Amino acid sequence: MKPSIVAKLEALQERHEEVLAHLGDADVIADQERFRALSREYAQLTDVTNCFKAWSAVQDDLKAAEIMLDDPEMREMAQEEIRDAKVRNEELEQQLQLLLLPKDPDDERNCFLEVRAGTGGDEAAIFAGDLFRMYSRYAESRRWKVEVISANDGEHGGYKEIIAKVSGEQVYGHLKFESGGHRVQRVPETESQGRIHTSACTVAVLPEIPDAELPEISPSDLRIDTFRSSGAGGQHVNTTDSAIRITHIPTGIVVECQDERSQHKNKAKAMSVLAARIRAAEVRKRQEAEASERRNLLGSGDRSDRNRTYNFPQGRVTDHRINLTLYRLDEVIEGKLDMLVQPIVNEYQADLLSALSEQD
């Protein structure tokens, strides 16, 4: 392992011990906010510290075994210990490299999931409904909560657009690579000739922004319109102007929310989505400015990217970003997404590891 990486690990181990000492300090214990922050840092450092201690112990074992090689009676046992230690050393180095990868602070957060019908008319809207159902099933399997913020129903089923908040553990970290273009190839129910049609949807996944990190939005930059809700809602539908449309004038970003009967609640939800979109636009702009020649798997989250093709006649789903094809579309569309999500995460980590290995 490179000396620079060892030095970095030694510094993290020292910090781990330092944080532990702080956690036993009476002043820190009395300051609950600082205590919680240090507790989180301690938890984050524990895995890498324990792994580094195990790696250091293996180095000691290797040195001891190499000394034993000089003793003819111990040589055979020493050679066996060296073989075992080298295998263990390689395993621990791989673990340490993964633990050293830069963490995306947004990975722990809830997210807003947006699915929009693209080209393909009614069939695209139906596919948008299928995608949202797929993500909802996936969320259910992970015990996440899905809360619809806004939905614009398609004329023959599905959605022209649907926005939902997904809450739970590591939500954004699992869903962020879903941002982009999704294409479906299948025979529509209304197709009498049996011809395969191609339709498309776009998916955007935005991390929820904590109140403390909300971008400053001047009221003068907003245009707020109210209108009457449409869709399900019983006797209260169309009786009050409870739906909200907020336009952020500088960026042209528009958010609607009509899910709640309370105008105040709709406005609060719409502002949360607006803040997430503004921040995402800022991040995208910064990523584009800092873009290097190195391939970036996630890209900027550009919705024109073609992520996947779902081919129903062949039961095939293809992720074009990593050239992965699975003939398990029936399982994927029912929400078993880990078989697609994990390979992308692995590829992304491999890119980061490659960059880490190029550092001094």
From Swiss-Prot:
Pfam families according to UniProt: PCRF (PF03462), RF-1 (PF00472)
Protein name: Peptide chain release factor 1
Cellular component GO terms, alphabetical: cytoplasm
GO MF annotations in UniProt: translation release factor activity, codon specific
Keywords: Cytoplasm, Methylation, Protein biosynthesis
Function: Peptide chain release factor 1 directs the termination of translation in response to the peptide chain termination codons UAG and UAA.
Modified residues (N5-methylglutamine): Q235
Disulfide topology: none
Post-translational modification: Methylated by PrmC. Methylation increases the termination efficiency of RF1.
Domain of life: Bacteria
Localization (cell): Cytoplasm
Family: Belongs to the prokaryotic/mitochondrial release factor family.
Region (Disordered), start-end ranges: 285-313
InterPro entries recorded: PCRF (IPR005139), Pep_chain_release_fac_I (IPR000352), Pep_chain_release_fac_I_sf (IPR045853), Prokaryotic/Mito_RF (IPR050057), RF-1 (IPR004373)
Classification of source organism: Bacteria, Pseudomonadati, Pseudomonadota, Gammaproteobacteria, Enterobacterales
Biased composition (Basic and acidic residues): 285-308
